[in-house]
Amino acid sequence: LSGGQRQRVMIAIALACRPALLIADEPTTALDVTVQDQILELIDDLRRDTGMAVLLITHNLGLVRQTATRVGVMYAGKLVEEAATASIFRDPRHPYTVKLLESVPTAHRRHRALAAIPGFVPDASAYPDGCRFAPRCHRAFSVCPLVVPRNLAAAPKHRVECHLYDPEFQARALPPPVEIAEAPAAAAPQGTAESLLLARGVEVHFPVTAGVLRRVVARVKAVDGVDLVVPRGVSVALVGESGCGKTTLGKALLQLIRPTAGSVAFQGTELTALRGRDLKPFRRRMQIVFQDPYGSLNPRLTVGEIVTEGLRAHGREDSSAVDVGELLKTVGLDASAASRYPHEFSGGQRQRIGIARALAVRPDFLVCDEATSALDVSVQAQILNLLRDLGKRLGLTYLFITHDLGLVEYLADLVSVMYLGRVVESGTVEEVFGAPKHPYTQALLAAVPRVDATGRKRILLGGDVPSPVHPPAGCHFHPRCPEVMPQCRESYPPETPLSTSRCVRCFLYHS
């Protein structure tokens, strides 16, 4: 069974006793956005049909905006704010809620830093006195660390635990800080920039073996003929559902996986023809930040040893002379962290260590493979601010591999949408997100729950992504496509340019 089917089975088990209350604890966290949309639609239909109540536990604020009637915001074991969904998103009252919503990457925050919350959630075994959020609060005043806030009515049917709304302490409260908007960033070069990396017809097929003799009986077509241009100094995003081949493509570009066919050129040098020592100088210039900040760091090494791993791998005997402290400061960590071990750090701090390791060899090109997917919203904001700042200061070129379309809108300049091993649409973020052309891109964008969008048109796709071992004949998307035509079942659509920076593979646009 697929992930979506398994979740349906779990829902059926939960409904077997006809409950009055269904508690859905992160029911869609491990699912792709299109399957997530199906599950949310199913739960909502069941709620209406049976009259049961649903308690949704989630960290996805877009999902909350889309599905919930009322919202309770928790921090350090306390319900700090509770109100109608529209009221929370329109007029949040608790400083934690305010910062949480401001830390979500969206298109309208594209040219300014996200609101990151300093510090960490306190240990549940040693909560501080007074307000538990006070050590991290930008509005905290003298009373906050000393007195536990009361549960107050900030507005009709809007409850909040905060001294800012307590008449007894309001006179002592600090006024909200004046925020100075950042100047818009210069537009990223489009089309005219020098190509740092150029991929043509890249294929990565994995053999499927069977029997005692391990005969090859089929091939998994993980990447099946992809063209990709990454201009220097530009941030490119690869998006798509799980299993579409985006991570495999990223590894093939770095030559961590050898392409079955096609070519990958880095600054005009063909990488697929290089081996061993000839490839090593290019490995230094191309680095990767992995998805898992826990599994990607060796627990037996100190942070200083981890950061200089790349230097030692490239034969730099003077790796100890590299200023590890400065590198750690570059990614927002204290220099004293060099002597500590990974288990002493939070997920966000570990991801910063991974970024420092990648930067130690001074790369030109950085692949970020779901680099923030394992992090909380506020920690994600810190990492996105860091990547944005490093891109400006060091002139880095990024390839973001992600399913988080809010991140793409906030950070990327160009985007390529993948489906079952092939790119179906590509262009600037403004073009693709502003007016998606391919039916799959339209469904993908419609399925993403957003904190800043209401009344969106929903496009529910049937079924799951087909197997890359036996992809459908013709256009791979046709079994799920709401716009399917007879020719879609017969041949794969050719690439159709719509502008100098935009292409789509769909017969709807092929003359």
PLM feature spans:
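A short, proline-enriched helix->beta-strand linker immediately N-terminal to the Walker B motif
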Residues: 16-20, 360-364
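P-loop NTP-binding/switch modules centered on Walker-like glycine-rich loops
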Residues: 23, 27, 31-113, 367, ...
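Short catalytic/signature loops enriched in Gly
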Residues: 84-195, 208-213, 428-511
